[in-house]
Every structure is written in C-alpha cells, then in structure tokens.
Regions:
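N-terminal core-binding DNA-recognition domain of tyrosine recombinases/integrases
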Residues: 10-105
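Basic, Lys/Arg- and aromatic-enriched nucleic-acid-binding interface segment
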Residues: 117-145
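Short, basic (Lys/Arg/His-rich) helix/loop patches that form interaction surfaces
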Residues: 238-304, 309-313
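Basic, alpha-helical nucleic-acid-contacting "clamp/cap" segments
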Residues: 168-223
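Short, leucine-enriched amphipathic alpha-helices that occur as contiguous helical runs
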Residues: 29-30, 120, 128-133, 234, ...
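Solenoid-like repeat scaffolds
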Residues: 61, 122-127, 154-160
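DNA breakage-rejoining catalytic core of tyrosine-based enzymes
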Residues: 102-120, 170-182
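Short, charged phosphate-coordinating catalytic segments
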Residues: 137-163
Length: 313
C-alpha cells in the first residue's frame, strides 16, 4: 500500500508540533517521494540507498544543504510511516551521509549563475537571517539600481503594506506578496551579533535598512549622494552574498540573481500570453520588465534576446 494524501496530512500535523516547518516544502518533499513509490513499487520508507539517491538526483539540487534538509524530513517521515504501518525496516535516510548526497548535486546547475524560482525558494529556506533572505529575494525581484542603491537604502517607509508595493526614488515599483512584505519588515528590524574578524570583538549590528552597522559606529552611511556611504553599503551586500555562497556551496552574485529573476518573469510572460519569446520581448510588459531590471537602453529587446533566447529554444 502506497502513501496516501490523508497520511501525509496526518504526518504534517504531527511533524509540525515538534519543529517549525515550511509546510509547502515539506509537502513537496513527501509528494516527490510518493511519485517514486510507483516507480520502485514500494513505500518510500522501504527505499534502498541507491533508490533514495536516484530520487534526490531528480531534484537537480544546487546545494547539498538543501538535500540534507529534504533527507531530514524523510528520515522522520520514514520512522512515522513505518511505525504507523507496523513495519520493521532499515531506515535508509538515517544512514544518508553528506558525502553520499553531494554525489547527486547538480554540478552544472550549481556552477550556473541562473537559478529558478524553486532554487531561490530553497536557498531562502536554508538562510537563518531575515536580512539575507530579503537581500536574495529583492535582487531576484529586480531591486538594484546603480551601485545597488535601491537595495541598500531601502527602508520600511517605502513599503505600501495595503497595496503590497515597494516604491523607490528611481520611480521603480515592485509588487510583492504578503509573505515578502512580512519578510521585509522582519529584516528591517533585525539585529545581529557579528565579529568582523577572527580576533575582533563581537558587536551588535543594527539599522532600519537591510544595511546594518555596528551600534557604536560613528556614521550609519545614510547619505544617498555620498560616494563613500554608497560604496560601504554596496560592499556590505557583496560581503553578505559571498558568505551565503560559502555557507551553501553555491555561486551567488547580485547580477546573477537579477538575471534569474528577469528570466523567470520572461518565462511567465511567454506562458501566460501564449506568445513566442521574440514576440513577447516586444510587448509593453517586456519593456516594463526591462526597466525594472535596469535595462534602460532603447535596444532593450535585442539585449534580452541575446542574453535569454537560449532558454526558450
């Protein structure tokens, strides 16, 4: 007997009692396991190591951390379902090591700077700080501008919570969801304890922006027109992206995240309108996307075609 939807609901309810979970991701992990039950003709909690790795390989994960999180869900789920069905089985997921999981990471995708919306969501789920999650999300949505000033000088006053829009001095307007709105509010208010070197004292860093400074800093670099302030804030974002890349084992750049976001919007546009890629690029909607992602040339259509047509072949 394979796993059914009611059993998944029961497990999610039980699993959520003992830990904070992101239900959509946990459910997706379980649903993928159910798909492979039909392939291997057995319940997922009876999968062998080789079968589990084949399932994980189908995820095309860019980070071993993401696979470890999936495996953690299935490890607990396998215990729960085996107990429920009174089965004594060897829990493959208990023995799954980081080394084994690293073998099924999609290396080609990992090296690419272009990430899907699913990749971005998985990355965010592996980030502990609201600041880092907000930086990744905002870059993906097209917030940037010259020297990333739109991002680094962003504050809560720009967020229209009722209409779910973020407004910028540059005239840019970014629609957001309730979830992203809550994330931004959390990130603006977030404080951290951080050491700026191996021998440096741990300091509290805070600020009303995504940019944070030590609480005892002489300046918060808040002058939008001051070159040094802009540069310090820009370096702050680049340093955060470097640390995220190092921690998760992926390549993250501000340009790569913005290109990923633009491609995602282009793909949605083509799907929703039924137009070909080249036809869609010449629509008013595509022009607005180009401006949103700081492609302000009159040749924006040709620039987009040259950069992204390979993804629509």
């Amino acid at each position: 007997m394979y796993t059914n939807e009611q059993e998944i609901e029961d497990f999610l309810q039980e699993y959520g009692r003992s830990r904070v979970i992101i239900e959509t991701t946990t459910r997706a992990t379980l649903n993928r396991a159910v798909e492979f039950e039909y392939k291997f003709n057995k319940p997922f909690y009876q999968f062998t190591t080789e079968e589990a790795l084949e399932m994980y390989e189908s995820v095309h994960a860019i980070s071993v951390v993401s696979l470890q999180n999936n495996n953690l869900v299935l490890k607990h789920a396998a215990r729960w379902f085996a107990y429920k069905h009174k089965k004594t089985v060897e829990n493959t997921y208990e023995e799954m090591t980081k080394e084994l999981l690293s073998e099924v990471v999609d290396v080609n995708k990992q090296r690419s700077l272009i990430l899907s919306r699913e990749d971005i969501n998985n990355l965010k789920e592996n980030l502990l700080n609201a600041i880092d999650r907000a930086i990744v999300e905002m870059l993906f949505l097209g917030v940037g501008g010259e020297w990333l000033k739109e991002l680094t000088f962003m504050d809560a006053s720009q967020v229209d919570k009722e209409n779910l829009i973020v407004y910028f001095k540059t005239g840019k307007r970014i629609p957001i969801t309730d979830e992203i709105c809550d994330l931004l509010m959390e990130a603006f208010a977030e404080e951290e304890l951080m050491s700026f070197g191996s021998t440096s004292r741990v300091s509290r860093v805070a600020g009303r922006w995504l940019y944070k400074v030590r609480c005892n800093a002489l300046s918060d670099n808040s002058d939008y027109n001051d070159e040094q302030s802009v540069e310090r804030r820009y370096r702050f974002i680049q340093r955060r992206l470097l640390l995220i890349s190092k921690d998760l084992g992926v390549r993250l750049t501000s340009g790569g995240l913005q290109s990923s976001g633009l491609l995602w919007h282009l793909q949605r546009g083509v799907e929703e309108t039924g137009l070909t890629f080249r036809e869609f690029v010449r629509t008013e909607r595509a022009k607005e996307l180009a401006q949103r992602y700081d492609i302000r040339s009159d040749l924006y259509a040709q620039i987009i075609i040259e950069k992204f047509e390979q993804y629509f072949v």
